[in-house]
């Protein structure tokens, strides 16, 4: 399961969405293939290869490369205007391990000999063995140039991750470089399930996720020019082949074409990792009050508490000293001086923070709805915050997680607790550390429950319901009120 919350980007998208009216026309099936943006924001480097043979073509059909090596597409590459005029040479790899050091030497030589360094807006090259990092690229241009990647006898790889289908280097809606994976819709859905949830979860939980993911896809297509959907938490997490498993493929197959509808139209099938025991009304996170996204109990969320890796999605604690909090919120555009207190000014009926005020030495700032997750780096808005003065705390030596947290806060060890242990086979004694007493600085302590926005289906709750014998349809009807399970057709 991906515990990253669907944050500000998703909020902005959904805020502008009107509630859908009932439709008289039949629902169109999903397309056989979809285009998924698999790059992060601000991508400037793409390493693309294949487990078989790779062919790369330009938009005009010209073949740039065909072979078995990795390719590199880069923006803003700094190069010598005329490498032949410099005395810099590439030494043996043992003598010149750092390409950064080599570049610095080249830059210094260029400064001495007045050889200009230019910035190449876009270039395409083949990854070599490192023997000549200053080698000219296969192709360069003054702007991002569309490229098409096809694998023969294998799968494509992007930055080390394998993908089915084809890849395209293109531009997003703002003109930035992105990599788009065109893949059959069934494979996309199978990967989303395994990228969002553990593939070992109960079949009914995976089936519920399959229907929710398919429904989400049906309502979020055709919003971009060069791709259909984001491949991360801006829409749905998609890890390519790594997300697929026999269980997720089976979940897609057994629910083929099924989506959740309300008044004959696909719903906004929102979901999050853990609702903390109670889901939230949609208008308390997004803009619209949707009748099927009402607050409902989610008691099965508590099963996460027994998980060695998922327990922090049920209950969690986040701590900041005042300087740390000032730095954290400052990086997100809030400057109130040194934070002095945080007032939770409005709560929802479920206890989630609807608005808060940060009061500091030089002012205050109000934040609302789902924003506290972003500004404070929290797992959910179902939280409380307290201020703690300087104090001491004992930590057992086995509690490595708490030791790491205290080191982050700048806590200092004031006493070490040890005991002598006698070796029964020898006369020697060994000193065993039992724990430490730390002095903690004054700090803000956020304690909360849940992970994500809390609207719609809780993934941990769905797993708990499945363990209790509930079907996928029963799970979906619990979290999305008044819905029908409808055959859409397609994947």
Positions of the model-derived regions?
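Conserved, single-site charged/polar hotspot
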Residues: 2-491
């Amino acid at each position: 399961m991906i515990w990253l919350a669907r944050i500000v980007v998703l909020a902005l998208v959904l805020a502008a969405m009107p509630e859908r009216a009932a439709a008289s026309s039949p629902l169109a099936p999903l397309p056989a293939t979809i285009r998924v943006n698999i790059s992060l924001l601000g991508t400037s480097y793409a390493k693309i290869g294949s487990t078989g043979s790779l062919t790369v073509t330009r938009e005009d059909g010209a073949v740039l490369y065909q072979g078995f090596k990795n390719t590199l597409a880069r923006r803003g590459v700094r190069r010598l205007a005329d490498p032949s005029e410099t005395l810099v040479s590439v030494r043996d790899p043992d003598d010149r391990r750092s390409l950064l050091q080599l570049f610095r030497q080249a830059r210094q030589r260029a400064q001495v000999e007045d050889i200009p360094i230019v910035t190449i807006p876009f270039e395409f090259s083949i990854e070599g063995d490192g023997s000549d990092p200053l080698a000219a690229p296969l192709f360069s241009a003054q702007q991002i140039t569309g490229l098409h990647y096809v694998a023969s006898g294998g799968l494509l790889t992007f930055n080390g991750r394998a993908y089915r289908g084809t890849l395209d280097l293109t531009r997003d809606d703002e003109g930035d470089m992105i990599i788009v994976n065109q893949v059959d819709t069934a494979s996309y859905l199978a990967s989303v399930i395994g990228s969002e949830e553990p593939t070992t979860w109960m079949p009914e939980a995976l089936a519920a996720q399959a229907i929710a993911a398919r429904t989400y896809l049906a309502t979020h297509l055709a919003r971009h020019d060069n791709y259909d959907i984001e491949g991360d938490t801006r829409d749905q997490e998609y890890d390519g082949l790594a997300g697929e498993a026999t269980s997720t493929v089976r979940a897609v197959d057994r629910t083929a074409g099924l989506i959740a509808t309300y008044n004959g139209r696909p719903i906004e099938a929102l979901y999050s990792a853990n609702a903390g025991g109670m889901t939230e009304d949609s208008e308390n996170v997004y803009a619209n009050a949707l009748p099927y996204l009402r607050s409902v109990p989610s008691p099965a969320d508590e099963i996460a508490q027994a998980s060695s890796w998922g327990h922090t999605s049920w209950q969690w604690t986040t701590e900041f000293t005042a300087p740390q909090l000032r730095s954290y919120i400052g990086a997100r555009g809030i400057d109130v001086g040194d934070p002095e207190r945080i007032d939770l000014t409005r709560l929802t009926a479920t206890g989630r923070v609807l608005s808060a005020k940060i009061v500091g030495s030089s002012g205050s700032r109000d934040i609302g709805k789902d924003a506290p997750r972003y500004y404070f780096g929290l797992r959910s808005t179902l939280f409380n915050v307290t201020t703690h003065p300087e104090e001491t705390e004992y930590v057992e030596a086995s509690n490595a997680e708490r030791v790491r947290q205290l080191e982050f806060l700048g806590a200092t060890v004031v006493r070490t607790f040890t005991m002598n242990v006698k070796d029964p086979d020898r006369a020697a004694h060994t000193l065993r550390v039992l724990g430490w007493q730390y002095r903690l600085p004054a700090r803000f302590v956020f304690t909360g429950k849940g992970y994500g926005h809390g609207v719609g289906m809780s993934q941990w709750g769905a797993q708990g319901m499945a363990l209790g014998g509930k079907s996928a349809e029963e799970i979906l009807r619990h979290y999305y009120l008044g819905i029908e399970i409808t055959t859409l057709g397609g994947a």
